[in-house]
């Protein structure tokens, strides 16, 4: 995990649409989440995003634009979902950053 990112940092997640039939005028939704822990091989565990009280399930392989609100400032990166699971009452996903 990047040394500028800390456990507990708030993040915004935006899905990257890869379909050719996506309407370019459609505004993409931004979802809030939080960094929970470091994962293996520089991955990280984050909470599954919630919007209007509902969990937004993101598929394994889904590419994302991620904005980190850290103590060192705003950081943006592309990421991919490499796993998802439930731990207790929390729905989590493991993401891997694609850009530094």
What kind of region is each of these model predictions?
Residues 1-100:
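Structured alpha-helical
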């Amino acid at each position: 995990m990047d040394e500028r990112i800390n456990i507990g940092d708030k993040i915004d997640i935006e899905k990257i649409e890869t379909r050719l039939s996506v309407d370019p005028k459609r505004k993409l939704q931004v979802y809030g989440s939080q960094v929970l822990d470091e994962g293996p091989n520089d991955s990280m565990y984050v909470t599954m995003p919630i919007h209007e009280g509902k969990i937004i399930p993101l598929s394994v392989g889904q590419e994302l634009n991620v904005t980190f609100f850290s103590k060192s400032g705003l950081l943006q990166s592309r990421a991919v979902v490499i796993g998802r699971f439930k731990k207790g009452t929390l729905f989590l996903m493991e993401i891997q950053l694609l850009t530094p």
